Regions:
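Structured interaction patches on ligand/partner-binding surfaces of diverse proteins
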Residues: 17-23, 49-107
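Beta-strand-rich interaction surfaces with strong enrichment in secreted/lumenal proteins
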Residues: 28-31, 78, 97-98, 109, ...
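Exposed beta-sheet edge/beta-hairpin loop segments within beta-rich domains
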Residues: 29-34, 103-113
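A short, Gly/Thr-enriched small/hydrophobic beta-strand-prone motif that recurs across taxa
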Residues: 111-126
Length: 173
């Protein structure tokens, strides 16, 4: 857990070494922070406390580019800490974390997100209101997996020749 001041500097790092089955579902994790306004992140699979301390500013963390010759499932994952899970997800998707004012003990939420292999489809078509379209994707084959990725999402490709109208495919590099 990285707790930056309101300017995105002076991090307080709380490192938890999580092993075994607990890796995929961590709840009730405590972290150190001073009262005041902060931007808080969860960084999974960072490796060590020393590695986490290398992110001396929020900008250094968010601009991190990581290379991996093939995805192993152990790459770093980033989560934005917020008052609830929905806000955490929305902040991550926007790529902009908000300042949290810590006045005492409190509960927060963060969803950590894998940095690649997220595929999003958006299919639009004008239909009468009483019609429905069902899309069942049973298999997705990805021919070129990324070797370099960032911790934040961005829209990579837009394809205009979709099955029914516009299709947008969003991948993490």
């Amino acid at each position: 857990v990285l707790v930056y001041d309101e300017k995105g500097e002076n991090p307080i790092v709380t490192f938890h070494d999580v092993e075994g089955e607990n890796q995929t579902s961590v709840n009730n994790m405590t972290f150190d922070a001073k009262t005041g306004k902060h931007k808080i992140y969860v960084l999974a699979n960072v490796g060590s406390e020393d590695a986490a301390k290398e992110y001396t500013t929020e900008q250094a963390l968010l601009s991190k580019q990581i290379e991996s010759q093939e995805p192993m499932g152990t790459e770093m994952m980033l989560g934005f800490v917020a008052k609830d899970m929905e806000t955490s997800i929305n902040l991550y998707n926007s790529g902009n974390n908000e300042v949290i004012d810590i006045t005492g003990d409190a509960s927060f939420a963060a969803k950590v997100v894998p940095p690649y292999s997220k595929i999003t489809f958006k299919i639009t078509k004008d239909l009468p209101s009483d019609k429905h379209v069902y899309l069942a994707i049973t298999e997705v084959n990805v021919r070129h997996l990324p070797v370099k990725y960032s911790l934040l999402p961005y829209e990579k490709w837009t394809m205009d020749n979709g099955v029914s109208g516009e299709s947008i495919i969003s991948l993490y590099e």
